[in-house]
Amino acid sequence: MNTPEKTVPSRTYRIAVLPGDGIGKEVMPEGLRVTQAAAQRFGITLECHTFEWASCDYYAEHGKMMPDDWKAQLSGMDAIFFGAVGWPATVPDHVSLWGSLLKFRREFDQYINLRPVRLFEGVPCPLAGRKPGDIDYYVVRENTEGEYTSLGGVMYEGTDREIVIQESVYSRHGANRLLKFAFDLAQSRPKKHVTLATKSNGIAISMPWWDKRADEVAKDYPEITLDKQHIDILTARFVLQPGRFDVVAATNLFGDI
């Protein structure tokens, strides 16, 4: 007796495609090809909509990175597939970034920047003696606050007394949700280990506060091991001992590094 094949219900997602600048324009066609192949394999339909703004070419023509109704245009999408932003020969980097990508992150509250680090079969590794399976960890970067703010200013500009102030902003809400995401991720993995990227020996107010927040969140995850490492030695150990890491939780700047 033949049994009917099970069919996977098709799902349709609307994807905003923004190639942006430079390498973004080069890699986006191949990125879409891979994404469409994966979608076909898993019974997903992607409805892609390409937007030519959020680029320095658009800025050169319009004096801004995006149209005024950019958020309305993107709000109906399920995801944003973004290439790259920046062309400093024509637009200062802080103008292009704050005029596009950072707006996406803040306006849509994209508070997790998840960065997988994994060595695949067939990919040469610059680290001696490493093989697939030896390197497999995540960096969980806070994506909406922290060191990347526009709070501050310049005083006495152009004089010998010139002062520059730029402030970092951390909230209990922002730190807790980042840390909980990291611990939940670690809970789903065999090593069950979270490393906090910190610098509490030199940044004497905000980083000890982050250490404390991690200790508090860790109380709800007794099966997870937590350790804290200063960002300078942490980056060195990523190269020297990459296999020791599982999930790394980091502020906006440290996660970017």
Residue ranges, per PLM feature:
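Basic/polar N-terminal segments that are highly enriched at the extreme N-terminus
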Residues: M1-T12
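Short coil/turn connectors at secondary-structure junctions
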Residues: S10-R14, S75-A79, D109-Q110, P132-D136, ...
